[in-house]
């Protein structure tokens, strides 16, 4: 079994490297174009705020995962939003953000809220300063030959050895009527969702859990399909997925920079909602996926699955998720007040999220639009933006 796993990981690493090279080239290209930021009504709205120049020229170290929930990080950089807000930000995209935050190596990070709770309990100087994504929008992706949930029992899956400790897996397994406990599967851990995807593509596993673009990527390349969804996105069941967190030492030492970062975060999300095609282009370059995958991903985040991207803090949703997590023994007791700080949102001059959606998004991209309807509207609004991957 160990030899088989080693061979499997060697194959996956080789395949992932191929995509990684493309992603790396994309990031480099993004850096080369950094001096030619797109001028938009979003950056203009920031200039119209007449923000005072910050005396503190500290460069923020900001981290995010290769998950679509955290797109605001690369949008802030490549759409010129950080620059317009008068802050310098070094953006790093990898799966080690929680560890880096715990070690004090990052000032801010887009992190799953459960990691905030766990970090707080072990003494990590960390707080939730703004929301980023509601609960849900997390998928179980399987190979095309899987037609029933029970076929997954006993299979090799990218769900880790103890999936029962994951809230989204519990929801999806129960919806499919299959066992939650990891002992019923051959669960493997991976270093990234991209690696999980490559394992499915090369036939090494039968399924995995991930966020987009690695669900849409599987369907785009016909490698697999989205089989189940954690749908705690809105309404009475709304949960919490990931947030923009701050290292409290950084926030204490550089309060004005921290507040300006929160403003930039909100403006990046506004950009995604109102400039979806341009946002998708930035997304696809930074994440190393085809443009078509980036566009479909942005559609899901902003219309298809609801208004999932948000900076609005929802204490009730966070409490609901914590109650579920603590009841299952994911971590010890912690309260909302201990890990959430509303002061940064209040003091950073962000727009009211609900008002923004009502006035700037609903009239153009109402919920309920099909992908084709939404894309047609987006093309009309952004006629000069590319919507197809360039042929080489």
Where are the predicted features?
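Bacterial N-terminal signal peptides that target proteins for export
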Residues: 1-12
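Hydrophobic core
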Residues: 13, 17-21
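Short, glycine-/small- and polar/acidic-enriched structural segments
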Residues: 35-192, 206-212, 223-228, 237-238, ...
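Short, solvent-exposed loop/beta-turn-alpha elements that line the ligand-binding surface or hinge
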Residues: 84, 154, 232-237, 304-315
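Pocket-lining segment of extracytoplasmic ligand-binding domains
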Residues: 114-115, 195-287
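Secondary-structure end/capping motifs
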Residues: 254-335
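Conserved C-terminal helix/tail region of periplasmic/extracytoplasmic solute-binding proteins
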Residues: 326-392
């Amino acid at each position: 079994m160990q030899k088989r796993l080693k061979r499997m990981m060697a194959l996956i690493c080789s395949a992932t490297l191929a995509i990684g090279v493309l992603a790396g080239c994309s990031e480099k290209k993004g850096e080369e174009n950094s001096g030619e930021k797109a001028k938009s009504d979003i950056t203009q709205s920031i200039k119209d705020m007449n923000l005072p120049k910050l005396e503190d020229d500290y460069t923020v170290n900001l981290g995010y995962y290769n998950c679509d929930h955290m797109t605001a990080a690369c949008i802030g950089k490549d759409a010129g939003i950080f620059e317009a807000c008068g802050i310098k930000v070094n953006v790093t995209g990898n799966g080690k953000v929680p560890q880096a935050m715990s070690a004090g190596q990052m000032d801010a990070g887009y992190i799953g809220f459960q990691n905030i709770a766990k970090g707080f309990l072990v003494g990590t100087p960390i707080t939730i300063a703004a929301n980023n994504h509601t609960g849900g929008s997390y998928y179980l992706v399987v190979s095309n030959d899987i037609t029933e949930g029970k076929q997954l029992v006993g299979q090799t899956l990218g769900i880790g050895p103890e999936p029962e400790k994951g809230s989204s897996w519990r929801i999806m397994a129960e919806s499919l009527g299959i066992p939650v406990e990891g002992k019923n599967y051959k669960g493997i851990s991976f270093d990234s969702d991209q690696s999980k995807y490559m394992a499915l593509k090369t036939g090494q596993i039968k399924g995995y859990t991930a966020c987009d673009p690695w669900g849409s990527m599987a369907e785009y390349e016909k490698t697999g399909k989205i089989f189940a969804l954690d749908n705690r996105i809105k309404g009475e069941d709304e949960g919490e997925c990931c947030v923009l967190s701050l290292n409290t030492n950084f926030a204490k030492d550089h309060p004005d920079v921290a507040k300006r970062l929160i403003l930039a975060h909100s403006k990046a999300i506004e950009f995604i909602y109102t400039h979806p095609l341009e946002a998708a282009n930035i997304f696809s370059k930074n994440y190393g996926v085809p443009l078509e995958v980036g566009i479909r991903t942005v559609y899901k985040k902003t219309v298809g699955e609801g208004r999932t991207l948000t900076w609005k803090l929802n204490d009730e949703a966070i409490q609901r998720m914590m109650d579920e997590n603590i009841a299952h023994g994911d971590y010890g007791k912690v309260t909302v007040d201990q890990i959430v700080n509303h002061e940064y949102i209040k003091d950073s001059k962000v727009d009211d999220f609900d008002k923004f959606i009502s006035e700037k998004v609903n009239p153009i991209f109402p919920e309920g639009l099909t992908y084709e309807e939404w894309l047609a509207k987006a093309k009309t609004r952004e006629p000069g933006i590319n919507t197809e991957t360039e042929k080489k």
